[in-house]
Amino acid sequence: LFNETQRLFKESEQRAAELAIINSVQAALAAELSMQGIYDAVGDKIREIFDQADLSIRIHDARTGLIHYPYAYEGGKRIDIASSPLGEAGFTAHVLRTRETVVVNENMADAATRHGSFVLPGTLMEKSALFVPLVAGDQARGLINLIDVERENAYSASDVRLLQTLANSMSVALENARLFDETQRLLKETEQRN
């Protein structure tokens, strides 16, 4: 009974910590209407939560078929990754097509081969990876990719749940920013006609 009580107490503490993180991200998102500001706010918070983890936020432009990387860190440094065409294979294509989270905690080379994935030029092969879709409506518009280049089994079920919740919040904020930009554009067009 004591062990069960301790386990439940620990779970409650962990869940309370997750909710505090989610609330702080929600507060940051509420103050932000620019898309890049949203990428930066969420990306910075994820890096803080996951001990300065390497991560990228990838956005799919369905019109051009390109993947853009508005936020990317590797080895503790912000990096620029050139936009690239979305291929038919790979982790990114799979997540965008299925809208499913992918967790790879071991045997990364095997998982990469199975998915037809490859290491982006100028980046390192990870040992653990977490890919969480950014879904708006019925489409995955992008994803958050969290990686660990040093450890296998880096991501727990609670890590996955937390990142999924943050991705959902980010998706809503990005859609709101997109709609705000569209409304502003239409308003300007209307004013110019009058």
Listing of model-derived features with the role each one plays in the protein:
Residues 63-64, 135-140, 149-150, 161:
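Flexible loop/coil segments at beta-strand boundaries within sensory signal-transduction domains
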Residues 164-171:
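Allosteric cytosolic regulatory segments
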